[in-house]
Amino acid sequence: MTLGRREFLQRLGLALAALGMADATLAGLGNTYQQALARSSRRLALLVGINQYPAAIWQQKAPSEKGAFLQGALMDVELQRELLIHRFGVLPTDIVTLVNKQATGRGIVEAIQGHLADQAQPGDTIIFHFSGLGSQVHLTGRSASEHLPTLVPADGTLPRDEGDTIHDLFEETLAQILGSLQGVRVVTILDASGAAPRTSPLQGNFRVRSRLTIPTGTWQAAPGISLPVPQTPADDLSRSWPGLLLRASKPGMPALEGNWHGFSAGVFTYALTQQIWNSFPSQRQSWIFQRAAYKMETWSGAVVSPELRGELASKDKSDLLNTGGIPKPAADGFVKTIDAANRNAFLWLGGLSASLLPYCALGLRLQPLPALPGLAAVPQGTLIVKGLRGLTAKAELLGAESLSEGTPLVEIERRLPRDIDLCVALDPTLERIERVDATSALAGLSEITTTAPGEQQADCLFGPLAAVDQPSGESPAIDINQTDADQPENYAASQSGTAGIPLGYGLFSPNHTLLPGTAPEEGEAVKTAVGRLTPLLHELLAVKMLHLTTNSMSSQLPVRFSLETMESPGQLVLIEETLRSRQFAKTKTVQLSQPISDANQPKFQIQLLNLGQQPLYYLLISVLEKSRLFVYCPFVEPASSTEKIAEVVAHTSQLKPGSRLKVPMQTDNGLPWQRLQATELFAIACTQPFYETWKAIRTPEFRQSSDQLASIPDPLAMAKAVFEDLHRASQGKNTVSSPQELLVTLRSDAWATLLMRSPIIQRKVV
C-alpha cells in the first residue's frame, strides 16, 4: 500500500523535530532555550554530493561519449551545511562532506564508521545526506522482477555482463550499517532515486537523479564488513529503515534536479531547506513540510511524491524532541561575513523565495533580526544587495556600525521590473525545423523568452503531443462556479486522434505534464500552435507575476487567510498567515476531525481576517488549472462609467481592523473539494485601494457573479495593475508613479500576499 499524502506530511513533520526544530510558542521560548542549552546531545552529519560521474557509470555507452552529468548535488551539500550550522547550531567540526571523487563506495562507508559511529554517544543525532544518482539493480540468479535500490558512488562501475560485480552502495547495506549504531537517533536524507528505465536523463526541464537502465550483476560485501546479501525491496526497506528516512520520491519514481538563478540543486533538498529557513519555531512541523511539498509542486508543475519512512516515523513525535536544537527566527538568510571598513557584507539567502533571485541585484533590501527572538534587541541597519552568485549575495551596509556574522536577515523591500518575462523551454523532441519555427514564432511575442531544456529555469515547455498525452493527475476542465455534479467529461475524452499520432503542439509544466486546455483539436503547424496558445502564455505570465508578490514570511501586515467547511459547525482546514499575525493571535492550526475523502466532500468557504490596527484593501484571486484566473468582486450599485465603478469597488473592498471577509456567504455557492484540487488561491492585502487593478478588471467584458468568483477578462493587464498599486502604496499616498519607470518598489509594510493551495485529500487506497 502506498503512503498517502496526509500520512507523508504527518511523518515528515517528525523529521524537523529530529533535526532540532521543536514546537514552541513565542510565550514559552525562554524555557525552550534553557532546556535546549542544558542538553548535552550532539549532532554529527555526513553530507555526500556527487555531480561528476563518468558516463560509463550511469549509461551503457562508451566512456568517451558525453554524458548528462548532474549539476546540483554539491549545492545540496552546501544547502544542508549552511542550514545545520546557522539554523540548528551544529558545529562545523561535526560536519564532514564528501564530494565527487571523494565519495567512493569505500570512502562513504569509512566516513560513516570514522565520523559517525566512532564519535557518536548515546542520545546523539546522526544525519546522513546523499545527493547523486540512484539506481535499481538486478542480482544475477534472482527473479527478473526483483529489483533492489542502490546509491551510485563516484566509482560505481556499470556491469557489462551478468557476472560482473555491482559496485554501488546498496541501500540495504547502508541501512544495516546505520542500524548498528546503538542509542543514537538516525536521520537519513536521500535526494536520489531508482526510477524506472528511461531513454533520456531529462524529464521536461529537470534532470533525473537516476541511472537510465537497470543493470544486472553480482553483489560483493564491502571490505572489512560482514553483512548479508541484500534482498529487501525498496518499500519494505523504507518501512524498517533505522530512525527516519526522507526520500525525494517514492521508490521507482524520479528524484528531480532543477536550475535556478545561477545554480542547480535537488528539488527536494532546496524546497526542504528553504522552508525550514522560512518557518517560525511556533509553527507546526506538519505545516512546515506541507509547504515544502507545495514548493516542489510549484517548481515542477505537478504532484510530487516525497516520502518520510523509517522505524521512528510512526512513533509519537515527542520521542524525538530532545535533540538540543535552539529555535531561531524565521529568516530569508544570514550574514556570512562582514567588512566593516568598506561597509560591505556577504549574505546567504537560502530562505529567500527562489522566484525573487533573478531580481535581487535590482536593490533587494534586508534588515537584521535578533538571533534569539525576545531575548535580544533588534540590530540596526539595512543591507542592500548589489550582486548575487548562487545563493551568496554581496551587499552594502547602511545605517549601522556593524553586524555580527550569523545575524538573521529578513526582506523589507523588493524591486521588480515592470515587464516580467515568461521563459518557455523548447521540448528536446522537437525536430530541428520545428525548433527554428518555434523560436521564431515565440520571439515575436512580447515578454516571452525561450531556452533549451535543462539549461536554465523555465516556466513551461512548448512541445509536440500525441493522443496519449493528457494532464497527469489533473481534473478535467472545470468552471470555477460549477458544482461537482456539473463537471464535464474527462479531459482525455476530448482528445482526438489515435494513440501515438501527433496531434499538434501544446504547453507543458516544467516536469512535462500537459497543461489543461492546451491540446489542439486537430493537427497544426508550429506557428499556428503558438498563435493559438498566446492567450494562455499571457495567463501563465500573469500567474507568475502574482507569485512574485507572495511575502507571508516578510510582510509586516498581520493578515490571516483560511479555508473552512461551510457545514455547521464549520471546521478549519487550512491556514495561511503572515508571521506578523502571530503576534496578534497566537492560535494553532486546527486539523479536520475527519479527513476529507471521496465519500466525505464538504463545501468550502474562504475567510480573510485583518488582525491589525489599520484598514486594509483586499483582492481574492483564484487560479484554476494553472492558468484560468477568477476574482471575487463585491457587489456595488451601477455607476455612470466603468472607471467610476472600478473606483467604488476599490473603496468597497476594504477590511476594517479586526474584521473578517467570508466568500462565499451562501452554502449553495460553496467551493467543491474537486475544484479546489486544481486551484491556487491568492489573498492580497494592501494599505491603499487597488484602483488600477479594478480598472483593469472592471472592463465592459467583465461579468459580475454575485457571491461567487468571476472570470478576469485580461489577466495580464490585471497582474501589471497589481504591481502598480502595490508600488504606489509602497511610495506613499501622495506619490504618483510614472509609467516610464522601469522598476516597481514593494515595501513589506505596505502589502501582504498569501497563497493557499488545495486541501489535502485522503483517497481510499485499493
For the regions a protein language model found, what residue spans apply to each?
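Caspase-like cysteine protease fold
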Residues: 31-38, 45, 234-241, 279-346, ...
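Beta-strand/loop-dominated core regions that host nucleotide or nucleotide-derived cofactor-binding catalytic loops
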Residues: 362-417
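Caspase-like (clan CD) cysteine peptidase catalytic core
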Residues: 27-30, 42, 105-203, 288
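Glycine- and acidic-residue-enriched helix-capping/strand-helix junction motifs
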Residues: 55-78, 259-263
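Secretory-pathway glycoprotein ectodomains that are cysteine- and/or Ser/Thr/Pro-rich
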Residues: 501-605, 609-619, 623-766
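Active-site-proximal C-terminal subdomain of hydrolase catalytic domains
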Residues: 49, 99, 163, 167-171, ...
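C-terminal segment of N-terminal export signals and the immediately downstream linker at the start
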Residues: 23-62
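Functional beta-strand-loop-alpha-helix junction segments that form "active/interaction loops"
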Residues: 3, 7-11, 23-33, 69, ...
